[in-house]
């Protein structure tokens, strides 16, 4: 399904997100690099992301991965859609950026076995809702982190509480899928979007999956009236690494 929609997927999403998705992804990239354990000061006393190893899990067309690479990180993008990864590769080439793009089903294979592991940081943007066992996925990603490394999760969620959340939810679940289906001609894609978000639940449910994975929540952010949640979690010092990451 994602292969068939790869050519227009990002454009349609930006329209139905009213352009706000750019800011969300920039936040994820910036936050992933902000406190990576390998980050070092420059001669002028400013932090640098140069050389930090980052995994962009479920990286798709590379929007977050390219933000990370633009900031100097060494990025591994992992996804299962050849069409999406093809676009990511083309974008990287056009911008003169380097991405290590790997075809990998992270629900079936250990992230710690990917090239570049262990990683200083990992991003998971709008992919958690598509897996049957979110906590299990996050646990596997946590094992691929360097000690004290962090995972940044960005995900669409069911908003809760207040008038703003109700309006945002009405737009996201009723208006946006219709607009997306009209623009893309693929109603089933946007029907799946809303159904998977409802199945995942709210921001509190994402946080619960993070805790169930044995990770330590550090920060939670809500965007767009609570329709999008950002969660930052750290690998605890006692978490067991996969043999491939030791």
What label would you give each PLM region?
Residues 1-8, 172:
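N-terminal, positively charged/glycine-rich alpha-helical extensions of SAM-dependent methyltransferases
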Residues 8, 17-50:
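Conserved alpha-helix/loop element of class I SAM-dependent methyltransferases that forms part
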Residues 53-110:
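Class I SAM-dependent methyltransferase SAM/SAH-binding core
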Residues 135-150:
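A short glycine-rich, Lys/Arg-flanked "PGG" loop and its adjoining helix->strand segment in the class I
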Residues 154, 158-213, 219-221:
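C-terminal alpha-helical "lid/dimerization" subdomain adjacent to the S-adenosyl-L-methionine
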């Amino acid at each position: 399904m994602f292969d068939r929609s790869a050519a227009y997927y990002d454009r349609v999403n930006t329209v139905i997100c009213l352009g706000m998705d750019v800011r969300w992804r920039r936040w994820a990239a910036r936050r992933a690099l902000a406190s990576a354990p390998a980050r070092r000061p420059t001669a002028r006393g400013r932090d640098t992301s140069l050389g930090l190893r980052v995994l962009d899990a479920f990286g798709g067309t590379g929007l977050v991965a390219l933000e990370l690479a633009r900031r100097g990180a060494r990025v591994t993008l992992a996804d299962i859609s050849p069409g999406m990864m093809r676009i990511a590769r083309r974008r990287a080439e056009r911008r003169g950026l380097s991405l290590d793009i790997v075809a990998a089903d992270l629900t079936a294979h250990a992230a710690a076995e990917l090239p570049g592991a262990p990683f200083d940081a990992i991003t998971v943007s709008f992919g958690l809702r598509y897996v049957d066992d979110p906590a299990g996925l996050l646990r596997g990603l946590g094992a691929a982190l360097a000690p004290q490394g962090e995972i940044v999760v960005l995900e669409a969620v069911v908003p809760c509480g207040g008038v703003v959340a109700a309006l945002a939810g009405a737009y996201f679940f009723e208006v946006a899928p219709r607009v997306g289906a009209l623009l893309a001609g693929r109603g089933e894609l946007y029907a799946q979007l809303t159904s998977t978000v409802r199945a995942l639940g709210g921001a509190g449910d994402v946080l619960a999956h993070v805790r169930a994975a044995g990770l330590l929540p550090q920060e939670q952010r809500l965007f767009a009236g609570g329709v999008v949640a950002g969660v930052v979690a750290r690998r605890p010092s006692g978490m067991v690494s996969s043999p491939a990451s030791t």
